[in-house]
Amino acid sequence: MTLRTLQAGVAVSIALDRVCFFCYNGAVAHCVVEAAEDILDRRFSVLDKGFVRLIDYLGGDARIVQAARVSYGAGTRTARDDAALIDFLLRNKHTSPFEQVVLTFHVRAPIFVARQWMRHRTARISEVSSRYSLLSHDCYVPQETSVAVQSTRNKQGRASEGISPEQQQEVRAAFEAQQKAACAAYDALIQKNIARELARINVPLSLYTEWYWQIDLHNLFHFLRLRASAHAQAEIRAYAEVIIEITRAVAPCATASFENHEKDGVQFSGREFAALKALLAGEGLSLEGKERARFEEKLRSGLQQ
């Protein structure tokens, strides 16, 4: 990582591996992260026809550290101190320093993924407009192994077990036939000079769309905590996992702390914490009913319930 400045002053640098901090008169200016520079504008494929690209970024781990220390003017210390500070900030929910880091992505995903994505309103979004542009015929078709029946436990998800290969092939063929018919109907309306804003209204949710997405690191971590969860739909989870790796290139210490405390962590209620202490003391479990079932499932699966 390299910190650059346009200010005049005496430079002091502390080099640790690939990390180099330059402090001018106690201030840190523009932050250039080598690992992030290496992947700028690179396409990371997701699903069958989608991708994510990192278009731009502002700041990294060093920016978080400097934002946290600005109140008392302390300069940058060592990489170990910085990682410890970032970890302290994240686990104690000091969010403002993380909002100093901003990432901009170019995303291509099916419309149904985009609609889940855009429920996260603390971001800036610019999506391709089908009122101005002609739509492509690119539609998402799930892999055969992704085709499953409705879950009996999760009202908004599919079952973990699949169906027979013959049924999976039949469902995929039905998807493709419906998509082809919908796109042909769209083309027919366009050829009749029907307004694009009307011709588009029956296109399938599987059609791919594109958008630019700019978000600060604090709100990005919130997005990833929800969308990289095992509870999220598999398709948007695939995008979230790619974005985690891109984010790691920009802010590796912050991403590691996020994974440890939020993505892979579990929260306990007051009564659950009391029950956990009782178990550690060799006492019985006082929780009952659904509360007990949720608590035991947290301990078993490591997933938030």
Curated annotation (Swiss-Prot):
Binds 4 FAD per tetramer. Each FAD binding site is formed by three monomers. A motif (ThyX motif) lies at residues 119-129. SUPFAM superfamilies: Thymidylate synthase-complementing protein Thy1. PROSITE patterns: THYX. Disulfide bonds: none annotated. CDD domains: ThyX. Pathway: Pyrimidine metabolism; dTTP biosynthesis. The active site is at R227 (involved in ionization of n3 of dump, leading to its activation). GO terms for molecular function: flavin adenine dinucleotide binding; NADPH binding; thymidylate synthase (FAD) activity; thymidylate synthase activity. Keywords: FAD, Flavoprotein, Methyltransferase, NADP, Nucleotide biosynthesis, Transferase. FAD binds at S96, R119, H120, R121, E127, D216, L217, H218, H222. PANTHER family: FLAVIN-DEPENDENT THYMIDYLATE SYNTHASE. Belongs to the thymidylate synthase ThyX family. This is Flavin-dependent thymidylate synthase. The gene is thyX.
